[in-house]
């Protein structure tokens, strides 16, 4: 079985994403966000767009959305997804760093098994302000209106929080669910 690729967008938690997947016995490899899309398409069964400081340092990561593979965008990965598909981001009114209670508005395969409210760990200043056409807003919080979104037809999923850190309650479930999506 092909691995998942974790795209390094220069964020503080990208290596932790990789480590979490490997600790879960999910085969995963980290790649640069400058890896040619054709190479990515041949080498994996799903993509995790990790976090990072700015869209300007996202390399060619937005091109990976067009490969027909399932994609999970985390933090900056969500922003890459939103802007590449016609949405918008902005500086959040308060930003988020620390524990946040997220409310799930709509269940889907990525969020399967989670309760309607859950504690997550946030570490961001920007947020999605306009959800792209074809996407559904799945979750929000008091500090961020779009905590999760998805385009089910394209198998594109984005979350603002960090499931890879221990402060997110049951964060590994999200990776299990994404691995299942990539194995379908």
From Swiss-Prot:
Q: What is its EC number?
A: 6.3.5.2
Q: Which domain of life is it from?
A: Archaea
Pfam families recorded: GATase (PF00117)
Q: Give any GO molecular function from the UniProt entry.
A: GMP synthase activity
Q: Glutamine amidotransferase type-1 domain spans which residues?
A: 3-184
| A GO cellular component annotation in the UniProt record | cytosol
Q: What does it catalyze?
A: XMP + L-glutamine + ATP + H2O = GMP + L-glutamate + AMP + diphosphate + 2 H(+)
Q: What is annotated about its quaternary structure and interactions?
A: Heterodimer composed of a glutamine amidotransferase subunit (A) and a GMP-binding subunit (B).
Q: What is the protein's given name?
A: GMP synthase [glutamine-hydrolyzing] subunit A
Species source reads Methanoculleus marisnigri (strain ATCC 35101 / DSM 1498 / JR1)
Recorded name of the encoding gene: guaAA
